[in-house]
Amino acid sequence: MIHIVNLNPSIDYHLEVKDFKVNHTNRSLSEDFVIGGKGVNVSIVLNNFGVENYLTGYLGGYTGYYISKRLEDFPNIHDSFIQIDQKSRINIKMKMEGGIETEVNASGPTVDEKAIYALDEKLKSLKDGDVLVLSGSLIPGMPKDWYLKVVQTYANKGVKVFMDYASPMMLESLKEGVYLIKPNQYEFELMMNKSYQTHDEMIKDAKNLMNQYPNSRMMLSLGNEGSYLISSKNIYFAPTIKGDVIHTVGAGDSMIAGYLYGLNLGLNEVERFKMATAAATASVLSDRLAKFDKFNEYLEKVIIKEERI
């Protein structure tokens, strides 16, 4: 079974503004409320692909109630969130002319020791063969090393742990047996404490890193320049499928969901990576997270190349 942790989910308030001006009253062309959070996005795409999953973290207040009600629209998602007193956050996602996207993400509520204990207890149901996805930022009040401790605990029990968290902690998670990490270029540079001038240099360092951890793999997303799946055995590259980009929110989360879909089917690494690429494309080239029909359409167009350094 797939279990997804999204500690700090949100309501994302999407606004489209034609000509945004600072220190002026601006009018939107359109607006929409969408439940969000990296783990929520992974969960929804898996739902769209017919894969059952458990989604947990913290919800509270009228915003938390709204998120919980919206999750009822997805029959393959089991709402396993822990209720807290403080309200869940609202983020602002603003799209302007020229495809410019600006985000304002709220910090969210603060959890106490009781809430942390409740989540720790919930995770104890994980067993050998399960998949655990740790996705998104830590919630205020949570120990900074909480993710790492979870990896330490469950990777040693036969749980495949995925991590998508913008922190140097991704590097530490490799030492503890994390199954897959998914940085973008910024996150990889943060993890390595280094800036890269060329992709070749970056991929070389990524391969050298993964050579040290033969049981782990890295999906490195480079936006419109494609993505890589890197392990101690291979380097695979997937060029971007061309099309009109509608929005980029949830692209990386869709990659994880696509990979999980392939894993759930028992497919090999190359097929999983193809599905990751198709799922990300289906989200980026539409106005919502990937739907199964669009996923299948783009799956036929995915090209995977093996590279060597």
Regions found by a protein language model. Give the residues of each.
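Positively charged, low-complexity intrinsically disordered leader regions
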Residues: M1-N23
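Hydrophobic anchor at the start of a short beta-strand
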Residues: I2, V51-N53, H78-D79, V161, ...
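Substrate-binding N-lobe of the ribokinase-like
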Residues: R27-S88
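Gly/Ala-rich phosphate-binding loop of Rossmann-like dinucleotide-binding domains
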Residues: N47, A155, N264
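Conserved phosphate-binding/catalytic loop of the ribokinase/pfkB sugar-kinase fold
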Residues: M94-D128
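Conserved phosphate/ATP/ADP-binding segment of small-molecule kinases
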Residues: K144-K233
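Conserved phosphate-binding/catalytic region of the ribokinase-like
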Residues: L171, D200-I309
